[in-house]
Structure formats: structure tokens, C-alpha cells
Amino acid sequence: MSYSTQQDILDFVEDNNVKFVRFAFCDIFGTQKNIAVLASDLSKALEDGVCFDGSSIAGFMHVEESDLVLRPDLSTVTILPWRPTEGRVMQFFCDVEKPDGAAFGGNCRGFLRSMNRKFKKLGLTCNVGAECEFYLFENDDRGRPTRIPIDFGGYFDVAPLDAGENIRRDICLTMEQMGMSPQHSHHESGNGQNEIDCHHAGPLKTADNVMMFKQIVRAIAMRSGLHASFLPKPLPDQAGSGLHINLSLYMDGRNLFEGDIAPDSIAGSFMAGVLAHSRELTVFTNPLPNSYQRFGCDEAPRYVSWSRQNRSQLVRIPQVKGDNCRMELRSPDPACNPYLAIGLVLAAGLDGIEHRMVLQPPVNKNLFHPAEAEGLGLETLPASLEEAVQAAQESEFLHRVLPDELAARYFTEELKRCEALKNAADPAEYERVHYFNAI
């Protein structure tokens, strides 16, 4: 059934014993929020939207003009399977607008949607996939997270070294119940680290899937008495967690990343744009102070370069065929706002296409070894969140593509993060409370 009208939704609610409906959205950093509406009030909420206090949401509104409205995207409706079957809970993803119906500059879903439309106007179809890594930790006797991983397994290990296989199984089955398409599931390099990948989809669908995936993982982990962490570098001596973004472009049904990529082709110019703007984008793809502990080791890039297959590069072209042909951006981490991260990567690629940027030759060296990078003159990604904010603030490109309101508030909030950690009496404890326990 296609849920395209309000009556479709109301019929679904009645047929499935739904009692609560979550209107879900995210703040400027990608932290999911929601308002639950009782099913008896759903008709009015669908008609009028749901008003809320935008001044209480990071990066949204000032208190003197705080009202905002949630407008549900009816196509995103889903039942939350881990909630009770009696009095079931349903959820929409929502766009955010002003009370008079005017566009709200902080509506990150809207930003990604508008960017995708620009590709469609050029006759291009974007497919996006996300590879999301996360850690599973034990809780203490009081149910509080510890930094003790659930196992000592490594890459592709199996039980008993891999203690997360049943958790991943439950996650994948829940994803399928909710209309998502998990593709791969395995233990990652770090102790207690896991990865589950979804099939590629349109940009907005993939960003919604990332938000839903994190919600599912946390719910299944909590049900199992565990803590799921999407912190980029939760353990200093273990691999960091990434959110690799895979992108392919289609024109007239043909995958432009299939076969050799000419430096001045559409695919080549798209890659050139992503590489050219990668430093400016880093504050959006890697938004935490902790994010910068991940770069340069454990398969996380530091240099702005590309290659085929080589996992030490910022961008790589996997050795695959057909519809699987794509470029992979390896710098983003799972703490990012997926709507902004994917939207800005698309914007950078589009800038490359529109300005006919030419892709530079590949770098076929292992850049995890600093000696290999010496003498190549490669640009580096920012080494800290402060440096990333500065690069973004100085970016003419970002001033062109981002709504001024959104950019100003994002940079302000990021600088607050830097100052808070810098001024903390115990930075490690501050990170534990504000990031490890929450991200």
C-alpha cells in the first residue's frame, strides 16, 4: 500500500491498532528528536502540523521567535517493531517550517531535497549508500554505560570472538520489518565494533535510513542490556567508527562511474568537486572534537587524494561492476547530520560538474605511512574541530550553497562545543557525559 494521503494514514492507524504517532526530526547536529501525538488527535496534526518550541532545539530559533511547525512526510510512515504490539507506535520523519508556512532555514531534510532536485534538472540521478560502524559496550550494575566492549573480536571474526552476531541479526530483521534493505553485516576491526550496510537508495531515503538505523541499533542494544555508541573514536587504542558515503550518478540509465573515469567527464568532475571542497565540508562530516582523533589511522584518511581500491585515500573507487560502481568518501563519521553531510557532498560534486573541474591523477600510495606522503604536496583535512570551523567560515563555496541562517547557527554551535571542552575541568569526563553516553 502506498501511504500518500492523510486518509491512507488514518486507515493504517485504525487497521494496525496504533495508539501513538511520533513526529520525528533532528536538530542541526543530526540528533533525533520527536513529539508523540495520540492517534485520536492525528487527523488534526496531519492537517495543521505540530507546533513546537524551536528555541529549545540546538541551532534552531531564538526565544523571542521560537515557534516552528513539523510537517510529516507521509511516505516515511513506519511501525516501530520494538515497541509494544498493543497500542502500537508509528513514526514519520518531518520537515520543519515556520508557522506561516514559510521555509525554515534550519530544515536539513529540505536542504538535501533541494540539492537532489538540482541534479534531476541536469538529467542526473543520484544513488547514495552509507556504511555505518558502531561499538557495543557493557553496562554496569546500575545500567550506566562502561567503556568495556562486549568482545575481543576483530575484522570478520565469528563467535565466540564475535559476541555481537545475534544483536546484528536482530537489527537486520528489524530493519527489514521497517522497509529498509540491509545488505551486509559483520564484526569490524575494533573490539566490540560492528558494521551493517544498507542497499543504495535516493539521497533523502538514505539520510532517513541513517537516522532510523541509529534509532534501531540503540533500541536493540538497550533491550539486550548493552550500550551502542556512534562516537567516532570511543577507545583510543581501537579503530575509529566511520560513516562511509558511497555515491553513483546515472544519466539515461547508465552508471557514470562504470568503467574508466575520464578526468573531465561528469563523474570525474563530480569527484574533483568533492575533493576540492573536502576541507570546507569537514566540520559537517566530522562535527565533534573527538572526530579528529580518528583521522590518519585505522583506515580513516588524512590527505585529500583519491585512488582505486586504496583504503588510505579520502576517495576511492571500489573494484566492482555494474550498478555497484561508485565513489566512496571515507572521511565522514556517524556523529554527523546525514542530511547536511550528504547534501553538502552532493553540492560539492555539483560545483565540480558546473565548473568543469578536472580530476587530478590518482595517488597510489599507502598514506597511513607519513613517509609515503612526503614530497607529494597533498592538502590535508583539518586536524581539529577549530581548524575545521575556520575552513568552513572562510569558504566562498559554503556561503553560496548553504542558507545563511543555517550556516551561522551551525558555526556558532560548533564553536560552543570547542569552548565547552576546552574549559572543562576534566575533558575526558566531559566527553564521556556529553558524547560517549549520548552519540
What are these regions (language model features)?
Residues 1-439:
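Glycine-rich, acidic/polar active-site loops that bind/position phosphate-bearing ligands
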